[in-house]
């Protein structure tokens, strides 16, 4: 079973990064922690925004992103700048349909340009790129099912490796997708949530870490 990629004709609600001064790209020893957040502090740098179509905010020691509109997505960033990174986060559906999308962003340039590593609560996964606001997959022509993804409201540990031209998505310690891309060699990291025909998608993220590959 495959799923047609429909975000290519969707729209981005917002990219929610801070406008604060950003540091230069960091190059550290392999395994070094570049950034981490358990979302226990509401001033750790992530956006806090609420409107009818979507909202993003800290809640109960986690970071929640909710998309009320159909066929839409939102990205949130801490306002950093890295070259090669390994980003890991715990993610669980709180509300909405299993036919959703959520995951990790790397090499974020602006609201329309970044790489994303996405899974759904009904067990699909893919790696893609957003260029000038248009999204398409890099890993395959469509999102593909993976038995490594825990369905429904279960917590999944997602990991995205952005190393040189190589992009790799891990779910619960297992490689589920790989792709190559050469648009950008540095940028911000972030989190992403999206909806298809039905809105009301809410995802809780926790224990995010960014390390040197």
Task: Give the positions of each predicted feature.
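C-terminal motif of bacterial Sec signal peptides marking the signal peptidase cleavage site
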Residues: 18-20
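Short carbohydrate-recognition loop motifs
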Residues: 54-73
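Extracellular carbohydrate-recognition regions
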Residues: 27-50
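Secretory/extracellular carbohydrate-interaction modules
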Residues: 67-132
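Short, aromatic/His-centered strand-loop micro-motif at the edge of beta-sheets
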Residues: 133-157
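Extracellular beta-strand elements of beta-rich domains used
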Residues: 39, 206-210
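Flexible glycan-contacting loops in extracellular carbohydrate-active proteins
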Residues: 179-206
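Localized edge beta-strand/strand-to-loop motifs within extracellular or lumenal beta-rich domains
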Residues: 154-168
């Amino acid at each position: 079973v495959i799923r047609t990629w429909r975000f290519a004709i969707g729209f981005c609600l917002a990219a929610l990064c801070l406008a604060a001064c950003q540091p230069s790209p960091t190059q550290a020893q392999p395994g070094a922690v570049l950034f981490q957040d358990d979302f226990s502090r509401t001033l750790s740098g992530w956006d806090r925004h609420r409107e009818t179509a979507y909202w993003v905010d800290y809640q109960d020691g986690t970071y929640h992103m909710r998309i009320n509109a159909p066929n839409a997505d939102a990205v949130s960033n801490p306002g950093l700048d890295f070259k090669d990174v390994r980003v890991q986060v715990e993610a669980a559906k709180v509300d909405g349909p299993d036919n959703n999308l959520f995951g990790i962003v790397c090499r974020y340039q602006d609201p329309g340009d970044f790489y994303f590593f996405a899974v759904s609560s009904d067990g699909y996964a893919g790696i893609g790129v957003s260029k000038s606001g248009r999204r398409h997959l890099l890993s395959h022509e469509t999102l593909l099912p993976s038995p490594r993804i825990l369905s429904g409201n279960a917590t999944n540990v997602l990991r995205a490796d952005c190393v040189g031209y190589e992009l790799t998505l891990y779910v619960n310690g297992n490689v589920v997708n790989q792709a190559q891309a050469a648009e950008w060699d540095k940028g911000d990291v972030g989190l992403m949530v999206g909806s298809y025909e039905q809105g009301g998608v809410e995802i809780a993220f926790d224990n995010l870490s960014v390390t040197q590959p």
